[in-house]
């Protein structure tokens, strides 16, 4: 039923425009694609093309291509569905300033700080992953190309300088991040596509391997599931993205639509380009190279720069360097946004219990978070944290935060009951598989 107003005819309540209390013309104007939408698509793609894509070929090389294909059939559809659900549960929240406040709005302050802490731990692990990756891989490239005699990563201060620069850039605001990330992300997409095509000439059918026994295939597919998901995963940027849209848009429906649209565009681009690249790279890089990369704790691209020879080797090495460095840099930016938001939510939750909100110095809190982030990332670099092991360890937390908690909210909160359905069962099953994955990996 359409309702007349001084702004025009409000659309039927069953349509997005109607739910937003707008006419169709007002709705079209409100959801116009703008520079902010482009920025969040770029940030989402930048987040996804990070440790996932540069480390996935190592895991696939260790496990086999058949395992990867099975985990892809399970993982990619589930990933799309749970990222969509994650956005919807955030967008519906009465208060949307940070992840802990969203949970607090649904379940109360105690649940907010508990589940916010879980979300925080997931982001801490990814801070470890990217800070270690950018330090080790950049040092490896500089050494491989003869720029340095030894590995700069042997010095703890090299990593400290890198992290200080990245955190300083990340803390300057969304607009600067969008500008810096756009060129790097577009370059990454072109490089991923070009590298996938260039690898075709180096394919070897024996790298396909034989089909393993069913039991072993299923077990290894579950172990590989976290690596498959993280190859195009950008859940770390979804919370900052929804919060950004909620702060900009008066209508929750408009904010939800824009966030879902950005997610859909990013997912579609990533799936087409990254899946082809991952399969192509895996067919070109054998098991021995994967083992070597695992033992050296470096990415597949870093090891490719060492083993590729013949015509085009120089080009492959150069674009591998560009992809790897840009990948971990833009992914670090995305993770830092989520980390800052999660940390601020926990700190503010605690401080509001101790003092009135108006007495809290938010600028001081943000500076403290910057220093904390630098020290945290530097500690991972000094310890040379094993990246692939962290991905497995993070799996249960990711299963809880990305799948099981949103699913639980759907059953717990009446306003979210509309999201029940078969897709929710797939999300729950995927969450449970992610929870058991590391136990199978280390068994």
UniProtKB/Swiss-Prot annotation:
The UniProt record lists the keyword Lipid biosynthesis: no
Stated induction or repression of this protein's expression: 40-fold induced under conditions that maximally induce expression of the locus of effacement (LEE) large pathogenicity island (PAI); part of the dlsT-yhaM operon. 3-fold induced by D-serine during mid to late exponential growth.
Transmembrane segments: 38-60, 65-87, 111-131, 150-170, 183-203, 215-235, 265-285, 319-339, 368-388, 390-410, 422-442
Entry membrane topology: Multi-pass membrane protein
Disruption phenotype: Decreased secretion of a number of substrates for the type III secretion system (T3SS) encoded in the locus of effacement (LEE) including Tir, EspA and EspD; at least EspD is also decreased intracellularly. Expression of 105 genes is altered; down-regulation of LEE PAI (including the T3SS) plus other genes as well as up-regulation of 21 genes. Decreased ability to form attachment/effacing lesions on HeLa cells; those which form attachments condense host actin less well (pedestal formation).
InterPro entries, per the entry: Amino_acid_transport_2
Location of the protein in the cell: Cell inner membrane
Domain of life: Bacteria
Main location, first listed in the record: membrane
Entry GO CC: plasma membrane
UniProt keyword Transport, yes or no: yes
Keywords assigned: Amino-acid transport, Cell inner membrane, Cell membrane, Membrane, Transmembrane, Transmembrane helix, Transport, Virulence
Biological-process GO terms, alphabetical: D-serine transmembrane transport; serine transport
Family indicated by similarity: Belongs to the amino acid/polyamine transporter 2 family. SdaC/TdcC subfamily.
Function: Transports both D- and L-serine; allows growth of strain CFT073 cells normally unable to transport D-serine on that substrate. Transport relies on the H(+) gradient and is not competed by L-threonine. May play a role in L-cysteine detoxification.
Protein name: Serine transporter
Designated gene of the protein: dlsT
